[in-house]
From Swiss-Prot:
One of its GO terms (biological process) is protein folding. GO terms for cellular component: cytoplasm. Belongs to the FKBP-type PPIase family. Tig subfamily. Its main location: cytoplasm. Disulfide bonds: none annotated. Its EC number is 5.2.1.8. It catalyses: [protein]-peptidylproline (omega=180) = [protein]-peptidylproline (omega=0). Consists of 3 domains; the N-terminus binds the ribosome, the middle domain has PPIase activity, while the C-terminus has intrinsic chaperone activity on its own. It is found in: Cytoplasm. This is Trigger factor. Involved in protein export. Acts as a chaperone by maintaining the newly synthesized protein in an open conformation. Functions as a peptidyl-prolyl cis-trans isomerase. Residues 165-239 form the PPIase FKBP-type domain. Transmembrane segments: none annotated.
């Protein structure tokens, strides 16, 4: 066997495999005999047609099958010997068949050769989110909203109230049109953006008042005017947090306000600790990609584009709305997909340079750590799951990523900056 490797680009190669008759002859004869047994030719009993006629009729098909098998047999062997790192499946692009020689040309993408620049001098800022008593109260109030009651109030509307009224669209003369009227429309003000014209106009108004509003938001096709005749202001009244309500809310998991409040704090702290780590990892990866703009194979970009597309689809309930342009979305996501591919290669290179690996002991330690967070499974059960064929690759990849992350963090300078948690509304 002879081989010739041609670099087409940083991420593409072509491999020419040249085989002698001794190397492909046995496979060729087997395929010829198989064809001879199965092909029915008029004038000959099945399996008794001459080889020359079989070659004439089925030769191209036999040659293609032999080339495919020989390529499959030798490509892996050559890739290992030459330390080729394929990023895509090899495709046959040319076959030259002669009685004494078979030439097969394969095209494939590769992981490019590169070195990660020294990053020990990089400095990053990590947000350290501070959880205050006010944050805990706000979070509990969000939970209590699901158990509150809407009561009518004879007061000016607050930005957290619900304003109910009839909505008329006004014509150019400023007159109402009953054909363009919406009865008893509910404006839940706190869920409208602060700059929304309806929120701004209705806040501070009382039942019985009439308000003219010009909707000139960018999302509107053209400016339009409305009149809202307010009939009612409703305000959400939260229930008092008691031990009994805690039992109801948590399904008996907690029995006292004190324990429930402590758990809310723990959940917030864990959430924002994870958020802080994710933000730092995003900063680290962005910097390393910027400093190491490694070319990404198209097959990897396509794979990540598909992943992003499927993620978006799941967020929309499993399917896109009618008329959604999948291809346009892929194009829009391509820069993001390319960064995912670049980060994968950079992190793999860091792992390779540090000779990182994941042992059974690593998996056991990870299972022990996860067991501390679980109330339903012990470490042995979790370990058994992690070592199963269905989960082992996933958990190995998770632990390896953690090791890579720790290596990067150990080499760079990280300063902490206290930050208030963002206020969320539901």
């Amino acid at each position: 066997m002879q081989k010739n490797i041609k670099n087409v680009s940083e991420t593409e190669q072509e491999l020419e495999i040249i085989l002698s008759a001794e190397e492909f002859g046995t496979e060729y004869n087997q395929e010829l005999e198989e064809a001879k047994r199965n092909i029915q030719i008029k004038g000959f009993r099945k399996g008794h047609a001459p080889a020359s006629l079989i070659k004439k009729l089925a030769g191209p098909s036999i040659e293609a099958t032999v080339a495919e098998k020989m390529a499959s047999k030798y490509f892996g062997e050559i890739a290992d010997a030459e330390k080729i790192k394929p990023a895509s499946r090899a495709q046959i692009i040319d076959v030259a068949f002669a009685p004494e020689e078979l030439k097969i040309t394969l095209a494939y993408e590769i992981h490019p050769e590169f070195e990660v620049k020294d990053f020990s001098g990089y400095t990053f800022t990590q947000n350290r989110y501070v959880i205050t008593d006010e944050d805990i109260t706000r979070e509990i109030n969000l939970i209590l909203k699901g158990h509150g009651t809407l009561n009518t109030v004879d007061e000016a509307a607050l930005s957290t109230d619900t304003v109910i009224g009839d909505v008329y669209k006004l014509n150019e003369a400023g007159e109402t049109d009953d054909d363009q009227k919406t009865d008893n429309h509910h404006f839940t003000l706190e869920y409208l953006p602060e700059e929304n014209p309806f929120r701004k106009a209705l806040t501070g108004k009382k039942a019985g008042e009439s308000v003219d509003i010009e909707n000139d938001e960018k999302e509107s096709a053209q400016p339009s005017r409305f009149r809202v005749v307010i009939s009612e202001i409703k305000r959400l009244e939260l229930p008092e947090l008691t031990d009994e309500l805690v039992k109801e809310i948590t399904g008996g998991r907690f029995e006292s306000v004190t324990d429930f409040t402590a758990d809310v704090r723990i959940q917030l702290e864990q959430h924002f600790l994870l958020k802080s780590d994710e933000e730092l990892l995003e900063s680290l990866s962005a910097k390393l990609i910027e400093e190491n703009p490694v070319p990404a194979p198209n097959s990897m970009i396509a794979s990540f584009s598909k992943m992003l597309l499927e993620n978006a689809k799941r967020q929309m309930g499993g399917s896109f709305p009618k008329g959604f342009d999948d291809e346009q979305f892929r194009l829009a996501m391509k820069p993001n997909a390319e960064k995912h591919a670049q980060w994968l290669m950079i992190s793999q290179k860091i792992a390779e340079d540090a000779t990182l690996s994941v042992s059974d002991d690593d998996i056991k330690a990870y299972a022990d750590k996860e067991a501390e967070k679980s109330e339903s499974m012990d470490a042995e059960e979790i370990l058994k799951t992690y070592l199963s064929p269905e989960f082992r690759d996933y958990i190995t990849d998770t632990i390896l990523k953690e090791k890579i992350y720790n290596i990067i963090k150990s080499k760079v300078t990280i300063t902490e900056e206290e930050k208030s948690i963002p206020v969320r509304q539901e």
